[in-house]
């Protein structure tokens, strides 16, 4: 079919656009704005000539760079994104990590004497949110992240997968300052390590390993033998930490960006 046979309609309300040929739906796209002000899009499988007009509709609405991700095994979709004017931004690998301290090497690992570890359930929510924001500035692909207080409360505490034993906060015993956290979420499948981080002045003291030791010990005692996690392939410290724990790679994703004004042919509009 020629491209002009496709008509794009935005669903109301929401950030979903659908492509039609006459009265037949031939494709759809969903957009969402993350707390780091990055617009991500996701396509539903559709007819080949639906993707470009759907993407153009989102670009016209947001006026921003658009981001997309695909599994590195989805070669057809990777090629489609490249053909739509997306360029590869980064690669992220997924890992499976054991929780057994005898395997991870975390047996007996504890936090420094001047650090106290508390559950997120006992933390001040605003301070925890600001710590989360600060740590994400050093996570590839999430710089600029700023949580809305309401969204953070829902994401952190109202979710069914919140586990107070594996969402832990490191506190400077002298100043009371929040200086690090580990967050492992329990889901219907394997638990997932969502974030592990320590603020810059407190790094290289073994605090990240100590937080992981506490969270993984709790999981192991609960009978959860493995945890999933993701790390940017180019972020050597994160990858090295996971591999040192005995992690094995499961697969990965590729993140793409289409810069504002770039068309589906990859040319400047």
Regions found by a protein language model. Give the residues of each.
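A conserved beta-strand-loop-helix scaffold within acyl/acetyltransferase catalytic domains
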Residues: 29-36, 141-198
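A short beta-loop-alpha structural element at the N-terminal edge
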Residues: 1, 8-11, 115-130
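Acyl-donor-binding surface of acyltransferase catalytic domains
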Residues: 45-116, 254-258
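Helix-loop element at the rim of GNAT/NAT acetyltransferase active sites that forms part
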Residues: 1-2, 7, 131-146, 158-160
């Amino acid at each position: 079919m020629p491209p002009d046979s496709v008509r794009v309609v935005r669903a109301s309300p929401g950030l979903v656009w659908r492509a039609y040929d006459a009265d037949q739906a031939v494709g759809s796209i969903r957009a969402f704005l993350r707390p780091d002000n990055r617009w991500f899009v996701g396509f539903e499988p559709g007819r080949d000539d639906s993707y470009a007009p759907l993407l153009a509709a989102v670009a016209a609405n947001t006026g921003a760079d658009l981001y997309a991700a695909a599994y590195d095994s989805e070669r057809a979709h990777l090629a489609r994104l490249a053909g739509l004017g997306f360029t590869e931004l980064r690669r992220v690998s997924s890992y499976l990590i054991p929780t057994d301290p005898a395997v991870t090497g975390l047996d007996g690992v504890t936090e420094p004497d001047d650090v106290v570890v508390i559950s997120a359930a006992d933390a001040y929510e605003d301070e925890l949110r600001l710590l989360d924001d600060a740590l994400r500035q050093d996570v590839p692909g999430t710089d600029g992240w700023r949580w809305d207080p309401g969204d953070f409360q829902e994401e952190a505490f109202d979710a069914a997968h919140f586990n107070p034993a594996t969402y832990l906060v490191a506190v400077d015993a002298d100043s009371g300052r929040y200086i690090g956290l580990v967050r492992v979420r329990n889901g219907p499948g394997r638990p997932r390590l969502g974030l592990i981080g320590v603020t810059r002045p407190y790094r290289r003291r073994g605090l990240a390993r100590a937080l992981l030791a506490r969270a993984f010990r709790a999981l192991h005692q609960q009978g959860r033998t493995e945890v999933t996690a993701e790390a940017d392939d180019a972020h050597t410290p994160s990858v090295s930490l996971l591999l040192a724990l005995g992690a094995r790679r499961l697969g990965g994703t590729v993140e793409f960006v289409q810069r504002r004004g770039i068309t589906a042919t990859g040319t400047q509009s």
